[in-house]
Amino acid sequence: MTAPTAPTLDVEALRTAPESTFALAAVLAEDVEWIDVDQRTQPRSPAVLHGREAVLEMIADAESRGITSRVTDGFAAGDRAALTVTCSYAGGGQVLCNALLDLRDGNIVRWFGVQAWDD
């Protein structure tokens, strides 16, 4: 007899969703911790958001500025996952983010992303 498996993140559903950011928002835990590091928010002082509402506000702000986001690659295994997210600005600039995720019951409880921006 095998032990029941815990739900994991459905990366393929995120990757193929017409609006990846909406699909991603649906799998954020209420107590999610979202950490991003890039050239402006360097490792000693990363950008940190606490809670689902704070992350949703950040996503809404990006969308209000015409930024589109797509999950372009990733995998999940048990309570861990990794995603590649590509964001595009209306003017053609792009941001690439690779993130490691901690999961609980298939929802994201911790996001640690490293971003690279077009100059």
Segments from the language model and where they lie:
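Short acidic-aromatic low-complexity motifs
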Residues: 2-33
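General secondary-structure edge motif
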Residues: 4-5, 35, 39, 80-81
